[in-house]
Amino acid sequence: MDALQTQTVNSTTAPQPNYIPGLIAVVGCDGTGKSTLTTDLVKSLQQHWQTERRYLGLLSGEDGDKIKRLPLVGVWLERRLAAKSSKTQSMKTKSPALWAAVIMYCFSLRRMANLRKVQRLAQSGVLVVSDRFPQAEISGFYYDGPGIGVERATGKISMFLAQRERRLYQQMAQYRPELIIRLGIDIETAISRKPDHDYAELQDKIGVMSKIGYNGTKILEIDSRAPYSEVLEQAQKAVSLVAIVSDRRSLT
């Protein structure tokens, strides 16, 4: 695996933070079914507890669909942005242009704001299921880490933004979920589910995502290659236990 693709962000020496009661995050490579699982979990859990789904990535599939629906240029623009985004996000490429670094930093600020909203929602007693979760261990938006990358940034302004962004992710890493569900997959299954994705990028992401520790958060590993009914059942049992232990708002 390319060394630049998996640069580790310096960790802090602060004491391990407490988790956020009632917050569950589902993570994994593309093709593992994160969006489907989080949606179905919320539908099931809403029968018993006040439950809401939140997206803590950068841009959701819904955002991409909105761009596609723009008159005349929608489909072309979405493909163009996706291609540019893929090239800029890769840690194997050179430092992003200054304008791109500014946009990436703004995305990270937005992610921090969304995470704080999720924290407040969970603190109100709502059971929150998050699709994806930020981490500060490995650089790269691919892995939900810092996107600019202090390892590749050049120029005073870009380096300044990269360092600020790294601190942002170190702060976000202090917001630990009560439970992380990590969906595992192999490259052949992933590419069969996402044939439009780059094989090498998927393979890299599978390897990297399996190593992230999420600052000591409790992680439940589930094999997403299993029948979906089994995957959903395992996740439901784990999240239901979290809801009970964290005393979420009951509807019964």
UniProtKB/Swiss-Prot annotation:
ATP binds at residues 28-35. GO terms for molecular function: ATP binding; dTMP kinase activity. It comes from Escherichia coli (strain K12). This is Uncharacterized ATP-binding protein YghR. GO terms for cellular component: cytoplasm; cytosol. One of its GO terms (biological process) is dTDP biosynthetic process. The keyword Cell inner membrane does not apply. To E.coli YghS and YghT. The keyword Cell wall biogenesis/degradation does not apply. InterPro entries: P-loop_NTPase. Transmembrane segments: none annotated. Keywords: ATP-binding, Nucleotide-binding.
